[in-house]
């Protein structure tokens, strides 16, 4: 059996550009793409923390080291400059890979979209 699992996440990135008339996509700083194991043209889901919008597009390379998160084409209507977003990608993983310890790549950024940390799991949520 295959399970559709979280593969990659860039958590709380800041939208730096909205380019309505650019060919549709989301340009992401190459450093972030590599850290999160997202490749060019891979489908990504974007969840806007500020307004609750959730949409899908595909990733393209943004200038390395720029901190760029550019929503392009119709995606530009889903956020404003400065909005916080979560960018996620998923993969089909078989049971054997899961049993062998398969883990996602989770990347955490600061307010300039510089990497401040990473890990391979989401902590258990508690009521404290």
Curated annotation (Swiss-Prot):
One of its GO terms (biological process) is pantothenate biosynthetic process. One of its GO terms (molecular function) is aspartate 1-decarboxylase activity. Is synthesized initially as an inactive proenzyme, which is activated by self-cleavage at a specific serine bond to produce a beta-subunit with a hydroxyl group at its C-terminus and an alpha-subunit with a pyruvoyl group at its N-terminus. Its main location: cytoplasm. The modification Pyruvic acid (Ser) is found at residue 25. GO terms for cellular component: cytosol. It is found in: Cytoplasm. Substrate binds at residues 57, 73-75. Pathway: Cofactor biosynthesis; (R)-pantothenate biosynthesis; beta-alanine from L-aspartate: step 1/1. It comes from the Bacteria. The keyword Magnesium does not apply. Belongs to the PanD family. It catalyses: L-aspartate + H(+) = beta-alanine + CO2. The active site is at residues 25, 58. Heterooctamer of four alpha and four beta subunits. InterPro entries: Asp_de-COase-like_dom_sf, Asp_decarbox. Binds 1 pyruvoyl group covalently per subunit. Its cofactor is pyruvate. Keywords: Autocatalytic cleavage, Cytoplasm, Decarboxylase, Lyase, Pantothenate biosynthesis, Pyruvate, Schiff base, Zymogen. Its EC number is 4.1.1.11. This is Aspartate 1-decarboxylase. HAMAP family: PanD. It comes from Paraburkholderia phymatum (strain DSM 17167 / CIP 108236 / LMG 21445 / STM815).
